[in-house]
Amino acid sequence: MSGRVGDLSPKQEEALAKFRENVQDVLPALPNPDDYFLLRWLRARSFDLQKSEAMLRKHVEFRKQKDIDKIISWQPPEVIQQYLSGGRCGYDLDGCPVWYDIIGPLDAKGLLFSASKQDLLRTKMRDCELLLQECTQQTAKLGKKIETITMIYDCEGLGLKHLWKPAVEAYGEFLTMFEENYPETLKRLFVVKAPKLFPVAYNLIKPFLSEDTRKKIMVLGANWKEVLLKHISPDQLPVEYGGTMTDPDGNPKCKSKINYGGDIPKQYYVRDQVKQQYEHSVQISRGSSHQVEYEILFPGCVLRWQFMSEGSDVGFGIFLKTKMGERQRAGEMTEVLPNQRYNSHMVPEDGTLTCSEPGIYVLRFDNTYSFIHAKKVSFTVEVLLPDKAAEEKLNQQGAVTPK
C-alpha cells in the first residue's frame, strides 16, 4: 500500500488515527491538517509514530520561529527579487505546479555578497509556501487533491563557480530545511542539459537529500524535451523547454514567470567576503614555499581551495608531479595553474580545478620572492569526487560538455 489517502493498509489506518490523536494539541497551529497532510509526515518516517511526531512538532516550532504564516506577504530584498533565478510556470498533466531552477546564470557568490544568507533562505521558504498555496488552489479548481510539485533543474552552464563552498553550504541548508519541513511534496525532479561536472555537483548535495528524494531525481539525456512532454502538456511548457507556451510578448523563455538570474552588479554588494573557517595554518619562512600534495585517482575529480594570508600577499600555483615519492621544485613539475601572487591578506582567495588526469597534484604557497617577511597562511583544500551513478548515466546518454 502506498500510504496515501484511499490506499492505506489496516495497519496504516490505525497509525494515522493514533498519529492524529498524539499531535492533536498542535493541529490548530497548522494551516490544513487533513489526512493528506498527516500522511506526508508518516510516509516521510516510514509510519514510525514516534519519529513522525517528533518531525511534525519540530515543524510547528519552525513555523513559529520563522513566522511562516505571514511569510507570503514578506517581500525579499530587491537584489534577490532581481537575480535569484527560478520560478513557477505551468502545470504537469496531473495539474501539479511546475517549478524551474535555472542553474547556469545563477551568481551564487554575488548573492551571498549582496544579501544575507537568512534572507536567501527565507526567500526559499516563501517559495515553498507559495507552491503549497498553489497546490491548494489547484485542488479547489480541479476537484481532486493536489499536494506535490514537479521540478525542472536546467543545468546548462553549471560550472566550477557554482561549487564555491559557501554557496554549496547555503544550498545544503535550504535542502535540509526543505526535507525537514516540506516532506513528500516533491513529485519528481527532472535534470536537463547536465554537463560533465554534474556528478561532482550532485555528490556535494546528495548528503542533504533523503533516499526517497534521490529516487525521484531523473537525469535526462539528449531527448529531454520528448521526456518532458510525456509529463507536461505543450501549452504548459515554455517553447525554451520543448512546449508551445510563450509570454504575452512572445518570449519563448517565459521570463514573466521564470527569473533567469545573471551577474549581480557590484553596486549591490554589502560585503566582499564570507567568513570562513580554515582547516590548516602554516608559517612560511621568508624566501621559502609550502607544498601540499593531493592524490587524484581518476579524471573528473575537482580540487577546491580557500586560503588567506596575514599581513601581505602570497603566491599560489598548482603543479602535477613528474616523479613520485620525492619533493620536487616547481620548475621540475608540470604547471597546471600558473603561479601568481594574490592579495589574500585583503580578500580571501578561493578556486576550483577540474583534474583532467590522475596523479599527485601539488598546491604550492609561494613566499620565495619575500626576503624580509615570513607569511602565515590559513587554508582548506578538498578533493570533490563525482557521484559514480550519475556519471555513468551521463556517459550512457552523452552528456553536454560545458563551454
Curated annotation (Swiss-Prot):
> What gene does the UniProt entry assign to this protein?
Sec14l2
| Taxonomic lineage of the native organism | Eukaryota, Metazoa, Chordata, Craniata, Vertebrata
Matching InterPro entries:
CRAL-TRIO_dom, CRAL-TRIO_dom_sf, CRAL/TRIO_N_dom, CRAL/TRIO_N_dom_sf, GOLD_dom, GOLD_dom_sf, SEC14/CRAL-TRIO_domain
Question: Which keywords describe this protein according to UniProt?
Answer: Activator, Cytoplasm, Lipid-binding, Nucleus, Transcription, Transcription regulation, Transport
Q: What is this protein called?
A: SEC14-like protein 2
One Pfam family name is CRAL_TRIO_N
Cellular component (GO) terms are:
cytoplasm; cytosol; nucleus
Q: Which residues carry this modification: N6-succinyllysine?
A: 11, 51, 253, 257, 393
Main localization is cytoplasm
